[in-house]
Regions:
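Secondary-structure boundary elements
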Residues: 3-12, 61-68, 122
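Acidic-glycine-rich active-site phosphate/pyrophosphate-binding loop
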Residues: 23-37, 83-84, 138-150
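Glycine-rich helix-loop-beta junction characteristic of Rossmann-like nucleotide cofactor-binding loops
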Residues: 119-121, 179-180
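Condensing-enzyme catalytic core mediating Claisen C-C bond formation in acyl metabolism
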Residues: 34-106, 110-113, 192, 204-205
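Acyl-CoA/ACP chain-elongation machinery
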Residues: 6-29, 79-83, 136
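Structural motif
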Residues: 12-14, 56-58, 69, 128, ...
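Short beta-strand segments
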Residues: 13-19, 60, 189-192
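Claisen-condensing/thiolase-fold acyl-transfer catalytic domains that form or cleave C-C bonds
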Residues: 1-9, 105, 109-112, 127-205
Protein backbone atom coordinates (compact mmCIF):
# COMPACT_ATOMS: atom_id res chain seq x y z
CA UNK A 1 0.00 0.00 0.00
CA UNK A 2 2.83 2.40 0.89
CA UNK A 3 4.50 1.68 -2.47
CA UNK A 4 1.24 2.36 -4.32
CA UNK A 5 0.89 5.68 -2.49
CA UNK A 6 4.48 6.69 -3.30
CA UNK A 7 3.99 5.73 -6.96
CA UNK A 8 0.91 7.95 -7.13
CA UNK A 9 -1.54 5.15 -7.90
CA UNK A 10 -3.65 5.72 -4.78
CA UNK A 11 -3.94 8.41 -2.10
CA UNK A 12 -4.98 6.16 0.79
CA UNK A 13 -5.32 2.50 1.65
CA UNK A 14 -6.31 0.21 4.49
CA UNK A 15 -4.10 -2.67 5.65
CA UNK A 16 -5.98 -5.38 7.56
CA UNK A 17 -4.82 -8.51 9.37
CA UNK A 18 -6.66 -11.08 11.47
CA UNK A 19 -5.31 -14.09 13.35
CA UNK A 20 -7.47 -16.89 14.75
CA UNK A 21 -5.75 -19.48 16.94
CA UNK A 22 -8.68 -21.46 18.31
CA UNK A 23 -8.64 -24.22 15.67
CA UNK A 24 -4.94 -25.00 15.85
CA UNK A 25 -4.81 -24.68 19.66
CA UNK A 26 -7.74 -27.07 20.17
CA UNK A 27 -6.31 -29.56 17.65
CA UNK A 28 -2.94 -29.39 19.41
CA UNK A 29 -4.48 -30.01 22.81
CA UNK A 30 -6.27 -33.07 21.43
CA UNK A 31 -2.98 -34.43 20.06
CA UNK A 32 -1.06 -33.77 23.28
CA UNK A 33 -3.64 -35.73 25.29
CA UNK A 34 -2.98 -38.90 23.31
CA UNK A 35 -1.13 -41.67 25.18
CA UNK A 36 1.55 -41.98 22.48
CA UNK A 37 2.87 -38.42 22.96
CA UNK A 38 6.57 -38.38 23.86
CA UNK A 39 8.78 -35.52 25.02
CA UNK A 40 9.88 -34.67 21.46
CA UNK A 41 6.30 -34.33 20.19
CA UNK A 42 5.41 -32.26 23.23
CA UNK A 43 8.39 -29.95 22.71
CA UNK A 44 7.54 -29.36 19.03
CA UNK A 45 3.85 -28.70 19.73
CA UNK A 46 4.02 -26.69 22.95
CA UNK A 47 4.67 -23.23 21.35
CA UNK A 48 1.29 -23.54 19.62
CA UNK A 49 -0.38 -23.17 23.01
CA UNK A 50 1.05 -19.63 23.34
CA UNK A 51 -0.86 -18.35 20.29
CA UNK A 52 -3.59 -15.72 20.59
CA UNK A 53 -6.29 -14.26 18.36
CA UNK A 54 -6.89 -10.69 17.24
CA UNK A 55 -7.52 -8.32 14.34
CA UNK A 56 -6.19 -4.90 13.37
CA UNK A 57 -6.60 -2.31 10.61
CA UNK A 58 -4.28 0.57 9.74
CA UNK A 59 -5.02 3.48 7.40
CA UNK A 60 -2.10 4.75 5.31
CA UNK A 61 -2.44 8.04 3.43
CA UNK A 62 -0.36 10.37 1.32
CA UNK A 63 1.15 13.20 3.36
CA UNK A 64 -1.23 15.65 1.63
CA UNK A 65 -4.16 13.96 3.40
CA UNK A 66 -2.70 13.67 6.87
CA UNK A 67 0.18 15.26 8.75
CA UNK A 68 -0.12 13.51 12.11
CA UNK A 69 2.30 10.61 11.87
CA UNK A 70 4.86 9.62 9.24
CA UNK A 71 6.01 6.22 8.06
CA UNK A 72 9.69 7.00 7.58
CA UNK A 73 10.79 3.73 6.01
CA UNK A 74 11.73 0.14 6.67
CA UNK A 75 14.46 -2.44 6.22
CA UNK A 76 13.93 -6.16 5.75
CA UNK A 77 15.85 -9.39 5.28
CA UNK A 78 15.02 -13.07 4.80
CA UNK A 79 16.99 -16.21 5.64
CA UNK A 80 15.10 -19.06 4.00
CA UNK A 81 17.73 -21.63 4.98
CA UNK A 82 15.75 -21.84 8.23
CA UNK A 83 12.32 -22.22 6.60
CA UNK A 84 11.71 -25.59 8.30
CA UNK A 85 12.20 -24.40 11.89
CA UNK A 86 8.52 -23.44 12.16
CA UNK A 87 5.94 -25.21 10.00
CA UNK A 88 2.30 -24.30 10.35
CA UNK A 89 -1.11 -25.29 9.04
CA UNK A 90 -4.69 -24.66 10.22
CA UNK A 91 -4.47 -27.82 12.35
CA UNK A 92 -0.84 -28.02 13.44
CA UNK A 93 2.25 -25.93 14.10
CA UNK A 94 5.62 -27.58 14.74
CA UNK A 95 8.36 -25.38 16.19
CA UNK A 96 12.03 -26.05 16.87
CA UNK A 97 11.97 -23.32 19.50
CA UNK A 98 15.64 -23.01 20.52
CA UNK A 99 16.95 -23.21 16.97
CA UNK A 100 14.32 -20.70 15.84
CA UNK A 101 15.29 -18.27 18.59
CA UNK A 102 18.99 -18.47 17.73
CA UNK A 103 18.46 -18.08 13.97
CA UNK A 104 15.91 -15.31 14.49
CA UNK A 105 18.30 -13.30 16.64
CA UNK A 106 21.05 -13.62 14.04
CA UNK A 107 18.71 -12.36 11.32
CA UNK A 108 17.45 -9.56 13.58
CA UNK A 109 21.02 -8.39 14.21
CA UNK A 110 21.69 -8.18 10.46
CA UNK A 111 18.42 -6.32 9.88
CA UNK A 112 19.16 -3.88 12.72
CA UNK A 113 22.51 -3.28 11.04
CA UNK A 114 20.69 -2.20 7.88
CA UNK A 115 18.58 0.15 9.99
CA UNK A 116 21.75 1.66 11.45
CA UNK A 117 23.26 2.09 7.99
CA UNK A 118 20.27 3.44 6.06
CA UNK A 119 18.01 4.92 8.78
CA UNK A 120 20.58 6.13 11.31
CA UNK A 121 19.27 3.99 14.19
CA UNK A 122 21.18 3.41 17.40
CA UNK A 123 20.29 2.47 20.97
CA UNK A 124 19.99 6.12 22.03
CA UNK A 125 17.90 7.74 19.28
CA UNK A 126 14.94 5.33 19.16
CA UNK A 127 12.38 6.53 21.70
CA UNK A 128 10.02 3.54 21.77
CA UNK A 129 10.18 -0.01 20.45
CA UNK A 130 7.31 -2.35 19.62
CA UNK A 131 8.56 -5.89 19.00
CA UNK A 132 7.10 -9.21 17.97
CA UNK A 133 5.19 -10.57 20.97
CA UNK A 134 6.61 -14.06 21.52
CA UNK A 135 7.81 -14.20 25.13
CA UNK A 136 10.09 -12.72 27.78
CA UNK A 137 13.14 -14.74 26.74
CA UNK A 138 12.93 -13.48 23.17
CA UNK A 139 12.44 -9.88 24.29
CA UNK A 140 15.33 -9.93 26.74
CA UNK A 141 17.74 -11.49 24.26
CA UNK A 142 16.73 -9.05 21.51
CA UNK A 143 17.06 -5.95 23.68
CA UNK A 144 20.38 -7.11 25.10
CA UNK A 145 21.65 -7.79 21.58
CA UNK A 146 20.92 -4.22 20.45
CA UNK A 147 21.75 -2.53 23.77
CA UNK A 148 18.18 -1.24 24.08
CA UNK A 149 16.44 -0.19 27.30
CA UNK A 150 13.45 -2.42 28.10
CA UNK A 151 11.72 0.52 29.78
CA UNK A 152 11.16 1.90 26.27
CA UNK A 153 8.81 -0.84 25.19
CA UNK A 154 5.41 -2.33 25.98
CA UNK A 155 4.39 -5.98 25.88
CA UNK A 156 1.06 -7.70 25.38
CA UNK A 157 2.10 -11.37 25.18
CA UNK A 158 1.35 -12.05 28.89
CA UNK A 159 -2.32 -11.21 28.34
CA UNK A 160 -2.94 -11.68 24.60
CA UNK A 161 -0.40 -14.34 23.68
CA UNK A 162 1.50 -14.42 20.41
CA UNK A 163 -0.96 -13.02 17.87
CA UNK A 164 1.45 -13.37 14.95
CA UNK A 165 1.64 -10.42 12.51
CA UNK A 166 -1.26 -8.78 14.34
CA UNK A 167 0.84 -8.45 17.51
CA UNK A 168 2.86 -5.38 16.55
CA UNK A 169 0.04 -3.03 15.42
CA UNK A 170 -2.18 -4.37 18.20
CA UNK A 171 0.48 -3.68 20.83
CA UNK A 172 1.16 -0.24 19.34
CA UNK A 173 -2.55 0.64 19.50
CA UNK A 174 -2.77 -0.32 23.17
CA UNK A 175 0.42 1.61 23.97
CA UNK A 176 -1.11 4.68 22.30
CA UNK A 177 -4.33 4.28 24.30
CA UNK A 178 -2.29 4.15 27.51
CA UNK A 179 -0.44 7.37 26.68
CA UNK A 180 2.97 5.74 26.26
CA UNK A 181 3.64 7.28 22.84
CA UNK A 182 4.41 11.01 22.69
CA UNK A 183 4.49 13.50 19.82
CA UNK A 184 7.87 13.51 18.09
CA UNK A 185 8.84 9.99 19.17
CA UNK A 186 10.88 7.85 16.80
CA UNK A 187 9.17 4.46 16.94
CA UNK A 188 10.81 1.23 15.84
CA UNK A 189 8.49 -1.65 14.95
CA UNK A 190 10.37 -4.96 14.85
CA UNK A 191 8.84 -8.11 13.43
CA UNK A 192 10.44 -11.53 13.01
CA UNK A 193 8.45 -14.29 11.34
CA UNK A 194 8.83 -17.87 10.29
CA UNK A 195 10.59 -18.29 7.02
CA UNK A 196 12.74 -16.66 8.37
CA UNK A 197 11.71 -13.09 7.63
CA UNK A 198 12.52 -9.91 9.52
CA UNK A 199 11.14 -6.42 8.94
CA UNK A 200 11.90 -3.32 10.99
CA UNK A 201 10.04 -0.07 10.40
CA UNK A 202 10.35 3.49 11.70
CA UNK A 203 7.36 5.73 12.38
CA UNK A 204 7.75 9.37 13.38
CA UNK A 205 4.99 10.17 15.83
Amino acid sequence: VADMIELGRIKAGVVVDAESSRGVVEATMDRLLRPDVNSEKFRLNFPTLTLGSGAVAVVLTHRDLGQKHRLVGHVSLADTVHRNLCLGSPQEMLVHAQELLKAGLMLARKTWGLGQKFMGWDSSNIDFIVGHQVGSKHFTRLFDLFGLDQSRTFVTYPSLGNVGPTSIPLTLAIAIERGLIRKGYRLALMGIGSGLNCLMMEIEW
